[in-house]
Structures are given as structure tokens and as C-alpha cells.
């Protein structure tokens, strides 16, 4: 029986059966696939003589392995080319909608689905990618799955899942200038830990989230997984509806009015029951940068790197590992740390509003000597919109490279990689060892505006000093 949260309502509406194991057989309303985790799933289908049950509920694109500097086919990387050819064939043979390079709609899977109106409140959404929680910004229940589960969704449009607990995370108050959605989620993960959300869905609530745009909410929900939560969501509201209205796959006419009435009914009740509630004050959140090897190892820009005696016992071992790997001293400031590469993009921060905020910092300034700085739009549509606004010219005039759409340096599956012990100021979502392509490369996570400021200064700096 529903406890009155959006999570419980959507879960119950999509429950096909309760399995003998106690798990729920859950219907999946939208399945997103890409070139990395889908080939084996299609092979398993063929091996078992199965077909895609509801091809109209699956949408595909290429993002992880595509180069962002030169996207001419065939790719120089023969494996990358083979993966895309395989996805093209699998989609063609199974009647699956596919957004390929040059279609005008290709991009990172978690960018293109919302911008086309595919992602809607009340949906269950699955994708073979960790950051599927992004779509929860719309009031959907969205989660990443493994390759065998991709197979299961293709074959049955359902998954066997254990129901999650629900934690309400309230942030109230107005964010300070120079503090962005990225800082909010990094602050939450810092306080609750990278394992704090294990077994939970996070409901993001409070006046701070109510004031956020959809793209800001997507940034927050995108990184719920980095705090251990399986998914994160925001209740749909007028901001959600205004974003969706008129988009290609959004309901139209009378169907639109019916949809809003239904979406409104899904919102968590005022007396909803949560497993626990955590409250934060927006005024306490500063521009935040990670110093270590997990997204939970973050500090406000004016703080110093924590010393072992200031940490909980369970955090000291990974902190010691981080001090050594990052070559940073406990008690030292992170501000002023020299950087080598500055990357703006990813499914966390590669949307139009992210590029606008970074461009405000870059405008009229120059990238510091010796810094490699580049901007990678999250989709072909974002790229087109940014160019229509002249953002590309602002970046290139400042010395940034302006690239094609793709996942880029968020992960080491394409030509955009760190080299050796380079330090990256990155707007992406993970700072694990080797994440950006070099086994010894170092990643500092921050907002796009902070990355732009680091590129200009040549070092980690407080973006508030760069805002006109």
C-alpha cells in the first residue's frame, strides 16, 4: 500500500507482480540504450531466440565512445566504429528509434531524452548507465541497470527489483551568487557520504529545489547515485510542465491537460511517510570542489583539505589513499592548486544553462598559458542552441576548444583523456582513480563556472571573484 510518496505511487502503478523472492516485477515505461552496454544484451536475445517485446519503448543513441574533435566516419578507432555499426544494425533489425551522429538529435543519452520530451513525470525509466537517475528530475523513477538487465527489459519490458526505502532531502533557502546545483549535490554527498544512500531513493525537496530550473534539477538527480542512492527525484511542478510543453514527445492538446492532472496526482502527499528526513540550509553551501578520489571528498572553496583527526574512523583509510594519490597535503588549501586540463561537459553539466554560466566567466578573458580547456555540448541540439546564442564564439575567443557532442572526458572510452599525472578541473560526476583516462591522472570535480574560472586562472579559484 502506498505511503503517499511519489516513489511509492509510481512503483505501485508499475508493479506487474510480487515474485516469490519478494522482489517486484516492475514494468519499465522507457528504456534508453547506447553503444556500450547494449551489444551483449542483443546477442543474448538472439542466442535465446527472443525478440524485443516493445521496440517503441526503447530509444537509442551513441555517446560514450564517440570522438568529439572529429566525428567523420569511419572512426580512426576501429573498435569504436564497430560498436556504432553494431548498434545501428541492432536498432534497424528491431525497429528501435536511433539518434545517430549528424541526425541533429544525437547526444548523451541523459541529455537527449529530456530535451525531446521523452522523459516525463510518473515514468519508470531504465538504462545501462549509472547516471540514469538524471531523469528523476521530472518526477520519474529512473535507475541504471547492468547488461543482463538490459536484455531483460528488451525481452519483457520488465525488471525484477527490490523496493527501496525513501529518504527526503530538504534544502531550504536561497543559494549565494556563484553557488550552483553542482555545489548543492556535492555538499549533500559530502555530508551524507558516498554510501549513505545505499538502499534508498532520494526525494529532493524544499524551497531551494523548488526554485531550480529543470536543468539544475537534472544535475542534482544525476549525482544521486554518487551518494549511494539507486535513484533521486523531484516532485513535478509548473517548472516541469513549462519545460515539457511543446516538446516533440510531450502530450499535446487535450492529452496535455489530462497528463498534467495525472502528474499532479503523483506528487508526494503533505503527510507522506518517509524512512528518514535530512534538512540542509542553502546559505551554508559554498562553491565546492572535490580534493580526493570519491565525490564525497569535497570542501568549500575557502576551506582546507581535512586532516585525518577531523574525519570519522571509517573515512580515514580512503582519505590516506587520496592524500597519496592526489599528492595533496592535509590542512592545505585547495584554492591555488595548479591544473592542466579544464573540461566543461558531461551528462551532469553539458546542458545549455551550464554553458551559459561558464560563458559568463569566460567572456572577455583568456585561458591561462599551458592550459588545455575545452567545452563539449551534451547534445547536437545543445550545440546548435549554444551557437545560435554565440556561446561558441565566447569560448573560442577565450581560448577554449569547441567540440562535438559526446560523453568526452567524463570517462576513458574515447580520445579525450588525461595524460600522466595531469590534474583536471572537470564538470563531470566521478573523480575515481583513472576515471579520465590516465592511470595516474587526477580529477577535481566542480561546477562549469568554476571550471571556466580555473581555466582562466590556471588554478583552482573561487568563481565568486570572477563574476562581473
UniProtKB/Swiss-Prot annotation:
GO molecular function: 3-isopropylmalate dehydratase activity; 4 iron, 4 sulfur cluster binding; metal ion binding
Reported cofactor(s): [4Fe-4S] cluster
SUPFAM superfamilies from the UniProt entry: Aconitase iron-sulfur domain (SSF53732)
Short name of any one Pfam family annotated for the protein: Aconitase
Database matches in InterPro entries: 3-IsopropMal_deHydase_lsu, Acnase/IPM_dHydase_lsu_aba_1/3, Acoase/IPM_deHydtase_lsu_aba, Aconitase_4Fe-4S_BS, Aconitase_4Fe-4S_dom, IPM_dehydratase_rel_enz, IPMI_cat
Keyword Transferase: no
Keyword Iron-sulfur: yes
EC id: 4.2.1.33
Record's cofactor remark: Binds 1 [4Fe-4S] cluster per subunit.
Catalytic activity of the protein: (2R,3S)-3-isopropylmalate = (2S)-2-isopropylmalate
Pathways involved: Amino-acid biosynthesis; L-leucine biosynthesis; L-leucine from 3-methyl-2-oxobutanoate: step 2/4
CDD domains on file: IPMI
Subunit organization: Heterodimer of LeuC and LeuD.
Name of the protein in its database record: 3-isopropylmalate dehydratase large subunit
Amino acid at each position: 500500500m502506498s505511503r503517499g510518496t511519489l516513489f511509492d505511487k509510481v512503483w505501485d502503478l508499475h508493479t506487474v507482480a510480487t515474485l516469490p523472492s519478494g522482489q517486484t516485477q516492475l514494468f519499465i515505461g522507457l528504456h534508453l540504450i547506447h553503444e556500450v552496454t547494449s551489444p551483449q544484451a542483443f546477442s543474448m536475445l538472439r542466442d535465446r531466440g527472443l525478440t524485443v517485446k516493445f521496440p517503441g519503448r526503447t530509444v537509442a543513441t551513441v555517446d560514450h565512445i564517440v570522438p568529439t574533435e572529429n566525428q567523420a566516419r569511419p572512426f580512426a578507432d576501429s573498435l569504436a566504429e564497430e560498436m556504432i555499426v553494431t548498434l545501428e544494425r541492432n536498432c534497424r533489425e528491431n525497429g528501435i528509434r536511433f539518434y545517430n551522429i549528424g541526425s541533429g538529435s544525437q547526444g548523451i543519452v541523459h541529455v537527449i531524452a529530456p530535451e525531446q520530451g521523452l522523459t516525463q513525470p510518473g515514468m519508470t525509466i531504465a538504462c545501462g548507465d549509472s547516471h540514469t537517475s538524471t531523469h528523476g528530475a521530472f518526477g520519474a523513477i529512473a535507475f541504471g541497470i547492468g547488461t543482463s538487465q538490459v536484455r531483460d527489459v528488451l525481452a519483457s519490458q520488465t525488471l525484477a527489483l527490490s523496493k527501496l526505502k525513501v529518504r527526503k532531502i530538504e534544502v531550504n533557502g536561497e543559494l549565494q551568487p556563484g553557488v550552483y546545483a553542482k555545489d548543492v549535490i556535492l555538499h549533500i554527498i559530502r555530508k551524507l557520504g558516498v554510501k549513505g544512500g545505499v538502499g534508498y531513493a532520494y526525494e529532493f525537496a524544499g524551497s531551494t529545489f523548488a526554485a531550480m530550473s529543470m536543468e539544475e534539477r537534472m544535475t542534482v538527480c544525476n549525482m544521486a547515485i554518487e551518494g549511494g542512492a539507486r535513484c533521486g527525484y523531484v516532485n513535478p511542478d509548473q517548472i516541469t510542465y513549462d519545460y515539457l510543453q511543446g516538446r516533440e514527445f510531450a502530450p499535446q492538446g487535450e492529452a496535455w491537460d489530462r497528463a498534467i492532472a495525472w502528474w499532479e496526482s503523483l506528487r508526494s502527499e503533505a503527510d507522506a511517510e518517509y524512512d528518514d528526513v535530512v534538512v540542509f540550509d542553502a546559505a551554508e553551501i559554498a562553491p565546492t570542489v572535490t580534493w580526493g578520489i570519491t565525490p564525497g571528498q569535497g570542501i568549500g572553496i575557502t576551506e582546507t583539505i581535512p586532516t585525518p583527526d577531523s574525519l570519522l574512523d571509517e573515512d580515514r583509510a580512503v582519505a590516506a589513499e587520496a592524500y597519496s594519490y592526489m599528492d595533496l597535503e592535509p590542512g592545505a588549501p585547495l584554492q591555488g592548486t595548479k591544473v592542466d586540463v579544464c573540461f566543461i561537459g558531461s551528462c551532469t553539466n553539458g546542458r545549455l544553462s551550464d554553458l551559459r554560466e561558464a560563458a559568463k566567466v569566460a567572456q572577455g578573458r583568456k585561458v591561462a598559458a599551458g592550459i588545455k580547456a575545452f567545452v563539449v555540448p551534451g547534445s547536437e541540439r545543445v550545440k546548435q542552441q549554444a551557437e545560435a546564442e554565440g556561446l561558441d564564439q565566447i569560448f573560442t575567443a577565450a581560448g577554449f576548444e569547441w567540440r562535438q557532442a559526446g560523453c568526452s572526458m567524463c570517462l576513458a572510452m574515447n580520445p579525450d583523456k588525461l595524460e600522466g599525472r595531469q590534474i583536471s578541473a572537470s564538470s563531470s560526476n566521478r573523480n575515481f582513480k583513472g576515471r579520465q583516462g590516465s592511470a595516474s591522472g587526477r580529477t577535481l570535480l566542480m561546477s562549469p563556472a568554476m571550471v571556466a574560472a580555473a581555466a582562466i586562472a590556471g588554478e583552482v579559484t573561487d568563481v565568486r571573484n570572477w563574476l562581473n
